[in-house]
Amino acid sequence: KSLIVVPNHITEQWAAEWLQLYPAANILVATERDFEKRNRRRLCARIATGDYDATIIGHSQLMKIPLSRERQQAILQRQIDEVLLAISDAKRQKAENFTIKQMERTRKSLEARLEKLNDQSTKDDTVTFEELGIDRLFIDESHSFKNLFLMTKMRNVGGIAQTEAQKSSDLFAKCQYLDELTDSHGVIFATGTPISNSMVELYTVQRYLQYQTLQEMGLIHFDDWASDYGETVTAIELSPEGSGYRPKTRFAKFFNLPELMATFKMVADVQTADMLKLPVPKANFHTEVIHPSELQKKAVAGLAERAERVRARVVDPSTDNMLRITNDGRKLALDMRLLSSLAPDDENSKVSVCARNVYRIWAESTAQRST
């Protein structure tokens, strides 16, 4: 029984194209209304008892079908045990106090989640994922689930995010359940960008799809995986606020790539643009050099001051942070009006220059009805 999980906005498109390919197929397509509290049990009952060739749901809807309480407890307890082992190992190796404190925070967070789950006073009559009878899980655009928490002793290394998205943790738990059920043959990922920002994302994909293999190889912990396949490199980069340059360490140099790719290709069918030979029109690129206005220069200087305050930790992260500063930098680079509605309409901003070019090309090609 297959469950197809796709981005929310294309569930109906997937259904239409599925029926175009397989007109006689019996498929079930879930809508947002189906996952409202009063309708969810009815939908889950249809999935569990129906003989469908496929059930198609959206990314956000997958979390609304939880694993059983007992399985969630077992998974959380296993994660807590792994953290305790890592803390013990870090203390034995006399790791930095910051690293150990970070691991302790992780342990407390997991224990709080386990305690909340153990609260039997919470009535739970939700149909669980196991009760649906799903034995094949297909995830389209799987890179949307890349924020899976990892533990590492590395500090201040770019490309190694230790933030966790709840939807990623939920999918990881379901992947482990299906691994047990199908001997690691029940999960399929599809994406055009398995690695978008950092090679750490390859490790994340392997945790989803090759958890048992990593365990057998002794590479289940990121630091072990990283020591086998890569190293950190420090280089001079433009600062996020654009006010100057600074040294930045990244997990960016790799070795033993043949061995890494051989392991990865045990579960991956890689198709590049050259292999697919898709009909792609030739692009003619034109570079437009846009000079900043005085107002933009002042705004960039303000970003630099904000960044210094963030680095010095004199501002609350909920008030200002590097992500917000970078986002403001992108906005002001396009048009100052994105930052302030009171800013003047600059005819030499990126947006204005782009609009003039689009109109000019449209006017010149009107006779051919070009787009």
Description of each model-found segment:
Residues R40-A86, R92, F98, R105-R136, ...:
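Inter-lobe coupling linker of SF2 helicases/translocases
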Residues Q20-Y22, R71-I75, K153-A161, T204-Y208:
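Glycine-rich, phosphate-binding/catalytic loops in enzymes
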Residues S2-I27, D34, S60-K64, P194-E201:
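Conserved Walker A/P-loop ATP-binding site and its immediately adjacent core
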Residues H143-F149:
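Short, solvent-exposed beta-strand-terminating loops
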Residues K1, L171, Y203:
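Motif I (Walker A/P-loop) of helicase-class P-loop NTPases
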Residues K1, T366-T371:
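Short, intrinsically disordered, charge-balanced linker/junction segments flanking boundaries
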